[in-house]
Amino acid sequence: FTPWRIGNCEIKNRIVLTSMGGTDLFGWMEKNHFDKMGARFLREAAKNNAGLVLPGCQPVYNPMFGQWLYKNKKMYEDLKEWMPEFHKTGAKLFVQLTAGFGRSFTISEMMEKLYTNKALRVLSKPFMDLDKITATASPSPNRWSDKVPSREMTREEIHEFVEAFAKSAKLLQDAGVDGVEIHAVHEGYLLDQFTLKYVNHRTDEYGGSFENRYRFAVEIVQAIKKVCGEDFPVSLRYSVLSKTKGFRKGALPGEQFTEVGRDMEESEKAVKYLQDAGYDMLNCDNGTYDAWYWAHPPVYMPENCNLEDVEHIKQFVRIPVVCAGRMNPKTAAESIAAGRLDGAGFARQFLADQEWVTKMMEDREEEIRPCILCHNGCFNMCHYKGVPNDQELSDSLHLSRCAVNAETMQWDRHFIEKTKNPRRVYYRRRNRRDGSCQSVKAS
């Protein structure tokens, strides 16, 4: 719980609430409205001792309705009004801006029908231009569907995105936001697709050599620094290793395989290159959407599954390095104390219990409601019967609900009321340390 700095920005402790889809400040489904439910969640986490808070990623080009983020000035005015309330918590806020998904865009059956029917594709283009949304570094198969392939982005489109990042960052700075995070040379999202040789086969200045493959990410930070100043912090969401064997083929922990994406030799070079380009922090994990479980670890992934690789690349940079991915708080604290890490990233645990950091600080760990790593409410690719995610379509993306906390992001629908008829009850409580149970009486 010691302070640290990202550039000139001081963060009160080492706990980082990392981005999750659905915790956005600007909703996607209603043309980038200011999302009060997302804002409430973020403030609750900040109030309960998250030091650095990162909302869900904001596309600089909205895949719904095709609107550029910098063009809707009203939501920045709403954000500016809200920021003083947030800053009362003592936390800092970095808004995560994304270039989008490229070939990783999740394709539903409805989208397949829209794309494969020429008439429907034309009619749907004003509100969902799948051809533009799924464009990537080079022609590639979509991660989820064989029916919606990704075309190559044009140079003009790349330049449009670079300009949009700079304009959006400046508006966020003027609204009082403490910094931005660029999404992402991470998890096989669009920017990452440009860096990965198995996706990028371009022959222009955005493909081929190492410098060309990382050019898109470099131009973004340089454009932001030009309009916001060198002191405005810019973090980068970064996957150390791709852990990928090929399209739709991910590697498992301990598996011997040939890496088709970013290996450690390239990563050691890349982190220094990106630091020297102007990035002020690396927010790290592993994986691509072809190996998605490294960045969104389910229950069968080991604790701290990305920590060893993240600790390794910290040796090659001077800027702060954060690690996320099923982090154990005590292990993270040991790594930070030893100087092998600067910050610890947590995400879904905040959905399960927004007060968990406060409870840990007050030695009330037995009261923490743990994330059970099920993905049922927080990850919309995992829709089982009885899924706890009952959002309406007008909500942002059907994400960031929780199987063990019905109130999270649904306070207007699910809330606990004090009973008018109190009774004594008995229940069995499990000790999180040794697994033993005890009977407890409560009123």
Task: Give short role names for the model-derived ranges.
Residues 1-443:
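Flavin-dependent oxidoreductase catalytic cores
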